[in-house]
Amino acid sequence: MNNWNSITIKISREAEETISALLIEAGSAGVEINDSADYLNHEDQFGEVLPEIEQSELVEITAYYPENMPIVELKAEIEHKIANLADYFSLTGLSVTTNNLSETNWAEAWKKYFEPARITHDLTIVPSWTKDYLATGSEKLIRLDPGMAFGTGTHPTTKMSLYALEQVLRGGETLLDVGTGSGVLSVAATYLGAAEIFAYDIDEVAVRVALENIELNPGHEKIHVSANNLLEGIDKKADVIVANILADILVLMTDDAFRLVKEEGYLIMSGIIADKADMVIASAENAGFFLETRMIQGEWNCLIFKKTENREGVIGG
Ligand SMILES: C[S@@+](CC[C@H](N)C(=O)[O-])C[C@H]1O[C@@H](n2cnc3c(N)ncnc32)[C@H](O)[C@@H]1O
């Protein structure tokens, strides 16, 4: 029977996505995230709002590796990579620890975090190996292999991107999915009626993972995946652009997004930590967009901008 090792990293919340991707690139089949913000404002079974838990600025990210992988070297490699990110994230409170798990613990941890998750009225994310989950009514299943993917697709930034896509897509649109990662947003867009989707990621591994996941779903022929840095060199006009990347990177693409979005089209930006939202809003507004919708979950913001001459219904319009 195989045993497993885990590496747990405590780090500032803003580093969560990058560190998760780094742990998966190092060979983990997935990550488990423990974030106190997820428990804030939750209700108990009687509908009472639970008392606010003191909110830590740190998240705990745990990744699992088979015991035959050299855990000491892996830990050192990961610590080195994190140290190189010191200019991007606060490393205050950082800790990196390892643990040995029995097969039973591993199986439990894995199961707990990769169950089917109904995200919106119509969209449910289902692990690819769950064959017995049946869609009911108008429910559409997004099949993902979290073992290959950047997250399970149930992170607040992804969830809000899905809510936003459901809000703006009506059918027949051309969509650009910048930073496609697992491909989850592109697959969702096919279900929501988009006619043609161009998905980009800067990371070659993400491009491969996205292609593999997209193939698991009907409508995959509508999605074209390629490696690209943001929207550099792209000339495909789009009705909607969606990007779930960190704020500091999103601001680099607002001008290109404005160039490519058709009149009355939308730019959806997610992955924005609360205190950087104003910076992203200013960047998109300077490019010519108007803010139409702002969603907040815990520390995360998702913004829907519109390219329009008609300011009615836009925030501050
Ligand atoms: C948080 S993941 C989002 C994945 C997926 N779209 C979702 O919503 O769950 C961010 C993705 O953006 C990609 N990315 C980061 N910087 C990028 C850039 N400059 N150009 C294109 N993709 C980038 C990363 O490789 C990663 O796959």
From Swiss-Prot:
Q: List the Pfam families hit by this protein, alphabetically.
A: PrmA (PF06325)
Listed GO cellular component terms? cytoplasm
State its Enzyme Commission number(s). Answer: 2.1.1.-
**Catalytic activity from the UniProt record:** L-lysyl-[protein] + 3 S-adenosyl-L-methionine = N(6),N(6),N(6)-trimethyl-L-lysyl-[protein] + 3 S-adenosyl-L-homocysteine + 3 H(+)
Q: Where in the cell is it found?
A: Cytoplasm
Q: Where does S-adenosyl-L-methionine bind?
A: T158, G179, D201, N244
Query: For this chain's UniProt record, which GO biological process terms are given?
Result: methylation
Q: Which UniProt keywords apply?
A: Cytoplasm, Methyltransferase, S-adenosyl-L-methionine, Transferase
The record, for InterPro entries, names: Ribosomal_L11_MeTrfase_PrmA (IPR050078), Ribosomal_PrmA_MeTrfase (IPR004498), SAM-dependent_MTases_sf (IPR029063)
From the UniProt record, list the coiled-coil ranges: none
Disulfide bond positions: none
What Gene Ontology molecular-function terms does this entry list? Answer: protein-lysine N-methyltransferase activity
Query: What family is reported?
Result: Belongs to the methyltransferase superfamily. PrmA family.
Query: Its biological function?
Result: Methylates ribosomal protein L11.
Q: Which PANTHER family match?
A: ELECTRON TRANSFER FLAVOPROTEIN BETA SUBUNIT LYSINE METHYLTRANSFERASE
NCBIfam families reported for this sequence? prmA
Q: What name goes with this protein?
A: Ribosomal protein L11 methyltransferase
Lineage, top ranks = Bacteria, Bacillati, Bacillota, Bacilli, Lactobacillales
